Amino acid sequence: MKIIAFYLPQYHTFPENEQWWGQGFTEWCNVKNAAPVFQGHIQPRIPLNNNYYNLLSPETVKWQVKLAKEYGIYGFCYYHYWFDGKMLMEKPMEHMLADKSIDFPFCISWANEDWTRAWAQKNKEVLIQQTYGDEAEWKRHFEYLLQFFRDERYIKNEGRPVIVLYRADKIPCLEKMLLKWKEYARESGLPGLCIMYQCASYDHRRDKAGYLFDYGIEYQPNTVRIEQRKTLQMISKKVYHIVSDKLHIPQKLNSSISYSYDDTWKRILQMNPRDEKMIPGAYVNWDNTPRHKQHGSLDYGYSSEKFKKYLSAQIRRAKEVYQKNYIFLFAWNEWGEGGYMEPDEQEGYARLKALKEALVDTGELE
């Protein structure tokens, strides 16, 4: 089973972030400044040995890859930020490409969203807008990506480089752009592209461009949250305290939203794929209060033992129900959202050990 972990590159300084958020800002600032939002909530999460690394250090990436390989992760899916030719946080991915000594599969997810001040809960001022341009812009973007597609380590499906679109529903020119990208791929000597979408806000069955996608990723817990939120919205504040125990939701001490880890995973394991295009997802934990403070959302009831149990079940379902040899995992290093596999002071290597044991127990360790 090939487990591909989503990879956040925001662990180094760059001018735009310092302009918007202050000198020296990286994702680690959110992580360090995190605080509990209710009694028993574990924050901040601290990397083992205070390893607040810099992704521009070659040694950091080599350490990450060594760790991922040792514990059974197949590859990384790098988030890529492209705004009409303007790029942010491109250096870690470019350094990976340049250093051929790093023997590890990787692919790219274009995180095509506006950047706003929503993190800070100040307002939704747009810091940089996501636009899509014209055909010339699509070609510039493809030509930038082509150097990665041609790398022998790049993840491919039947020779076709995998490219993931984070928010396919946000692209007004989706059909025209994807048709052109496929054309550019053929002109470049590639056998084609393997195009996937990530967020559950898009459904290939309901869009005229849906036929251009080879696969859809059940990005978790994003996908299952849609149904959970519907349940929450049906509960009025008036009767919340009566039904909270039955829904496994702790009483709110603030405006954060809490979800049961067990309930979330049980819903995931009960899902049926939309059709044969779907690739299953998994997640280790969820807690975005380091970014959103008391306005965030989080899971409660997590343990590495539970993660192992649920991941084992999802690996079996990937083979038996989805008939796929891939699972996309949230995440390798989303410390600001609770989705990280890297060792921390609280659990040490427990998350990594749980993942490897799940692969071993299911006979799927490659």
Locate each region found by the language model:
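Glycan-processing catalytic domains of CAZymes
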Residues: 1-366
